[in-house]
Amino acid sequence: MKIRKDLCRVEKDGFFGAYFQNPVETDRCIIALLGDDIDDRMAVSGAKWLQGRNCNVMTMAPARKDYGYHSYPLERFEKASAVIRQKGNRKIGIVGGSTTGMLALAAASHYPEITLTIAMTPCDFIIMCTEQSCKP
C-alpha cells in the first residue's frame, strides 16, 4: 500500500514535516517525533501504525536526516498545529520517545490545542548546549 503524504518546509510552512492523511476519514491527528527524518522507515512505520488507530499523522524533524532536537524551536509546533487544523482535524496529540519525549512534553505544555501527550521514556531535564560546538 502506497502511503500518501504532504510535505511541509521550514521556509514555506514554518516547520519541517510530512502529513500522512488517513485513507479513512478522521478528525484526529498525532504529531509524531520519531527518528531523524520525517519519512524514514521509523517515521513511516509509526505513521502507518497510528493510521491503523484512526489518526492522521504529522511527522516532524528539525531538517532532513537531522536528529538535532537539542535546539528545536517550540514555535514550529504552533505552525504545525495550524496546518493540522486547516486539514480538518479537531483533536491534536503528540508522541515522542527519549529526547523527543521531552520535546513532546514541552510542546504540549506550551500549546493547549495539543490535548494528548505520549512521552515514552522522556529525559528528566531540558537539554541545552549538548553539542561541543554550542557556546553558552
Put a short name on every predicted segment:
Residues 45-49, 106-107:
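A short acidic, amphipathic alpha-helical/loop segment
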Residues 61-93:
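Catalytic nucleophile-loop/oxyanion-hole region of alpha/beta-hydrolase
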Residues 39, 82-136:
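Primarily recognizes the serine-hydrolase "nucleophile elbow" in alpha/beta-hydrolase
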Residues 47-67:
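Conserved alpha/beta-hydrolase
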Residues 31, 58, 116-118:
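Hydrophobic/aromatic beta-strand patches that form the interior of the parallel beta-sheet core
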Residues 1-28:
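N-terminal cap/lid segment of alpha/beta-hydrolase-fold proteins
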Residues 42:
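N-terminal carbohydrate-binding/catalytic regions of secreted carbohydrate-active enzymes
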Residues 27-35:
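Short beta-strand element of the alpha/beta-hydrolase
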